[in-house]
């Protein structure tokens, strides 16, 4: 069984930002679980500008904004599972997930739901 201090379910902008914030506060073992084949969530479809003014002090398209968070995440030791669907979360924070390589059981110290829309 895999064990993580924090497991973030959802690899869109909220999930990426939450994982990065947890890392900045000193959390060591962080996992992001994303059902899609890439991170970024709905932002990858938002081709209009207007993102990033608060966080990055410049106007970005949705994909550009997502890519900033993806790059920041890649520069850390945050683990990512793509193509993985969460099937169950128990009261004891045991997460059952199905990926391309079968079922996984993950023990989370804390879980954060950031599945978006």
Residue locations for each model-derived region?
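Beta1-alpha1 glycine-rich phosphate/pyrophosphate-binding loop at the start
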Residues: 4-68
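FAD-binding core/adjacent interface of flavoenzyme oxidoreductases
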Residues: 1-9, 66-117
